[in-house]
Design a protein with these regions (language model features):
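Cytosolic-biased juxtamembrane loops and peripheral soluble domains of multi-pass membrane proteins
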Residues: 46, 51, 114, 168-174
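Conserved beta-strand segments that form the floor/walls of ligand-binding pockets within enzyme
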Residues: 55, 99, 113, 173, ...
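Conserved beta-strand termini and adjacent loop/short-helix elements that scaffold enzyme active sites
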Residues: 45, 57, 137-139, 184
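Conserved AdoMet
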Residues: 2-76
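Mobile active-site "lid"/loop adjacent to the S-adenosyl-L-methionine
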Residues: 159-185
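Conserved SAM/SAH cofactor-binding pocket of Class I
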Residues: 66-167
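Proline-centered helix-kink/hinge sites
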Residues: 39, 63, 157-158, 177
């Protein structure tokens, strides 16, 4: 996002110096990273997931590479269903829902979350990636009943206990949304 070019362009233009604006931005990013341990993905505002670039900010969890395995499993299992209906509970940035919608073009994918801020990021990613078959809704799965039945329910729910929160690295506990990490038990 700093250079506004592809990875290949970086290699091809490796010897090209940064202009004063780029250098200033880079210095501010380095300060944020070194001084605060702020995750690079939040500093740049994006991350890669399943080969695609997704917008992220401190309102959504940074997608983990391990989560890509969930995508692989659903893709593998969905082969037996002509038009699968899939729900992603706690969709956050929408990376799981949007990826499934793009990888399984005949699927209808629904992403739900209790955070309107997260849903804004999910919608932004949907629009930028031009995903037509994913739909995002504000919903608390513990209170509200989903509107239909689904062939697949996928989720990367909060899984860190309140006691474990203190043991997390500074860049996780100080920057990632606690609502996405813990159920506060």
């Amino acid at each position: 996002s700093l250079l506004k070019c592809s990875k290949l362009d970086i290699y091809l233009r490796f010897e090209e110096p940064l202009d004063s604006r780029q250098l200033s931005v880079l210095r501010s990013w380095i300060k944020r990273r070194v001084k605060n341990n702020e995750p690079l993905q939040y500093i740049t505002g994006s991350c890669e997931f399943y080969g695609r670039r997704y917008t992220v900010n401190s309102k959504v969890l940074i997608p983990r590479q391990e989560t890509e395995r969930l995508i692989d499993i659903v893709i593998e299992k969905s082969i037996m269903i002509e038009k699968p209906d899939i729900i992603d509970v706690g969709t956050g940035s929408g990376c799981i829902a949007s990826t499934l919608a793009l990888e399984i073009s005949k699927a209808n994918v629904f992403g739900i979350d209790i955070s309107l801020d997260a849903l804004k990021i999910a919608e932004e990613n949907k629009a930028r990636l031009n995903v037509k078959n994913v739909f995002f809704y504000e919903m608390n799965i513990l209170i509200d009943t989903p509107f239909q039945t689904y062939d697949f329910l996928i989720s990367n729910p909060p899984y860190v206990s309140q006691n474990e929160m203190n043991n997390l690295s500074k860049e996780i506990k100080d920057f990632e949304p606690h609502i996405a990490l813990t159920d506060f038990d």
